[in-house]
Regions:
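RNase H-like, Mg2+-dependent phosphodiesterase core
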Residues: 1-204
């Protein structure tokens, strides 16, 4: 496929993935957060959630479900998302908390923290009246939120905000697992990121 043809396809994909955000913006919603997590399946490491608020004119090509992207591509996109986003919040829950309350509840806590941090950063940037007007979640619902929310099945492949959050969450967690690799060299965390590969099982 020629470069020009690929770019056309990427622009079409981006247009499709902005549809949810576009509809909300047309209904008067100013700040829309996409939220996703990574780390619900590994044998080791934290669950990490990200909340990303993008400007309506966001036009970075290639943003997609982080699982569909190479590590090199995720790293490059994450750097650009951090430059372009209006706000990015991160939430984490470590293994001890996951064991205490279960992975789903730990994920929800991490997501709530990520949303709270993103909103705080919005206020710092745009003033105390700024607040998230709608939250797009990837296949999850958070109880107790006053902010309107939508849960999208396969949201990281359907919403650009959720996709951006999936990339930020993945890169953030990967960096933490690389740090863990220095502390626990037997488990190859720098390669498997805590997932159940053969090397990880052999380390156990």
């Amino acid at each position: 496929m020629k470069k020009e043809e690929r770019e056309v396809l990427l622009r079409e994909k981006l247009c499709q993935m902005k549809e949810f955000e576009r509809e909300l913006t047309e209904n008067g919603i100013c700040y829309i957060a996409g939220v996703d997590e990574v780390g619900r399946g590994p044998l080791a490491g934290p669950v990490v959630a990200a909340a990303v608020v993008l400007p309506p004119d966001f036009s970075l090509l290639g943003v997609d479900d982080s699982k569909k992207l190479s590590e090199k591509k995720r790293e490059a996109l994450a750097a650009e998302i951090r430059e372009l986003a209006w706000a990015i919040g991160i939430g984490k829950r470590e293994p001890a908390r996951i064991d205490e309350i279960n992975i789903l509840e730990a994920t929800k806590e991490a997501m709530a923290d990520a949303v709270q941090e993103a909103e705080r950063l919005l206020r710092e940037r745009f003033g105390q009246e700024a607040k998230i007007g709608h939250i797009l979640f990837d296949a999850i619902h958070l109880d107790g939120l006053e902010t309107p929310q939508t849960s999208l099945i396969h949201g990281d492949a359907r919403s650009v905000s959720i996709a951006a959050a999936s990339i930020i969450a993945k890169v953030t967690r990967d960096h933490q697992m690389i740090e863990y690799a220095g502390q626990y060299p037997d488990y190859s965390f720098e390669k498997n990121k805590g997932y159940g590969t053969r090397a990880h099982y052999e380390g156990i």
